[in-house]
């Protein structure tokens, strides 16, 4: 039996202590030997990112997961800084920038609104696929395989039972993310 893919879970939430949904989602990940949970706000509260260290972590893993809340149709500021600095030209893109080619990218996102708010005729005016397009484009720029995002809509309003169900499914996927049904 082959080993499961090594997963780097980049977690970015500036108020993690207040996010019940994200804490529940993280729990199964912390119990899996093939998953490295890397809390960006815990490591870089001053936003001074150790770029060589982050790039080394990326090289060591096959699947990169970005878990974060949706903030103003994007990600928290530190994750945006991380993306801009770590996925640099010559490392992840451009001439010689093939360090992430063939790896897998997946966003795992919590939102404050229901799924129905993400439509052309609704509150947010665009479907989630449009909102997340910059992440998909970044994955393509890095020559990574884009995996459909996991989205927990209206995260604060999910019951404990619903969150536990999401966490189980997420944990099952993390345990073997590249299995035939996992992509």
Swiss-Prot record:
Which reaction is this enzyme known to catalyze?
A: a quinone + NADH + H(+) = a quinol + NAD(+); a quinone + NADPH + H(+) = a quinol + NADP(+)
Gene Ontology BP, a term: positive regulation of potassium ion transmembrane transport
Sequence intervals crossing the membrane: none
Source organism of the structure:
Shigella flexneri
Q: Which GO terms describe its molecular function?
A: electron transfer activity; FMN binding; NADH:ubiquinone reductase (non-electrogenic) activity; NADPH dehydrogenase (quinone) activity
Function, as annotated, reads:
Regulatory subunit of a potassium efflux system that confers protection against electrophiles. Required for full activity of KefB.
Pfam families, per database record: Flavodoxin_2 (PF02525)
Q: Which HAMAP family does the UniProt record give? A: K_H_efflux_KefG (MF_01415)
Q: How does it sit in the membrane?
A: Peripheral membrane protein
Against InterPro entries, the record matches this protein to: Flavodoxin_fold, Flavoprotein-like_sf, K_H_efflux_KefG, KefG/KefF
Tell me where it resides.
Cell inner membrane
What's the protein here called?
Glutathione-regulated potassium-efflux system ancillary protein KefG
UniProt gene name: kefG
Q: How does it assemble?
A: Interacts with KefB.
Asked if the keyword Cell membrane belongs to this entry, the reply reads yes
Top enzyme class, one word, equals oxidoreductase
Q: Where is the signal peptide?
A: none
One GO cellular component, as annotated: plasma membrane
Keyword terms, alphabetized: Cell inner membrane, Cell membrane, Membrane, NAD, Oxidoreductase
């Amino acid at each position: 039996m082959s080993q499961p893919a090594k997963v780097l879970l980049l977690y970015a939430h500036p108020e993690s202590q207040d996010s019940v949904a994200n804490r529940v989602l993280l729990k199964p990940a912390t119990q899996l030997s093939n998953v490295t949970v890397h809390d960006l706000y815990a490591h870089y509260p001053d936003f001074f990112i150790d770029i060589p260290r982050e790039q080394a972590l990326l090289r060591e893993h096959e699947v990169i997961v970005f878990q974060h809340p949706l903030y103003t149709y994007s990600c928290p500021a530190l994750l945006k800084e991380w993306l801009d600095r770590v996925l640099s030209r010559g490392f992840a893109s451009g001439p010689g920038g093939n360090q992430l080619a063939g790896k897998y990218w997946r966003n795992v996102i919590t939102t404050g609104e229901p799924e129905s708010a993400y439509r052309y005729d609704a509150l947010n005016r665009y479907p989630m696929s449009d909102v997340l397009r910059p992440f998909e484009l970044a994955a393509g720029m890095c020559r990574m395989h884009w995996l459909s995002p996991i989205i927990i809509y209206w995260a604060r309003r999910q019951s404990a039972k619903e969150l536990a169900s999401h966490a189980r499914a997420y944990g099952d996927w993390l345990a073997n993310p590249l299995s035939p049904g996992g992509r």
